[in-house]
Amino acid sequence: MGMVPDREPYAVGMVLDTPPGPGPAEVEVRRVASREDFLRSIRIAMESFGMSGRDLEEAMARADEEWETLRSNDAVVQFLALIDGEPVAQARATFTPIGVLLNGGSTLEPARGRGAYRALVRARWDEAERRGARCLVTQAGAMSRPILARLGFREVCDIRILLDRGAAGARGPADG
């Protein structure tokens, strides 16, 4: 079948069904509304997770197509968090008729611990509330699980992540 464990093969499903606290006053959050902000969000994500070189090139090569998809799909919303006017964190959410799925978020290392991610969770909660959704749901790995727990998310299930080595673009643990 070709299925192999992902680099981080275990995660938990988490849900937030009560309003999170606000982000700090020093953090401004805005919806990504321009191609430039979208490119900034890609760079933040890549740098935050230690990706560069080929990974960054591939992400930037897909950027225009992804930007057009984001612009034309109101169900997916991207946010940037700024401190002192500088983008330091990014996060995405997908809105469905029954809830909101948080799709990743990342904060540049120098800004960690300053509330940017907390502010992004609150922004996505506020958007969910505006749309009539009652909860936020996410898949959390080892890095994000304790952060999300501090923000009020609770664990609801265990997830084992497998990749199909035969699928285009699939990268397993041996791919580094």
Question: At which residue positions do the language-model features occur?
Answer:
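Conserved GNAT acetyl-CoA-binding A-motif
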Residues: 128-140
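Short acidic/polar active-site loop segments enriched in Thr and Asp
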Residues: 4, 134, 154
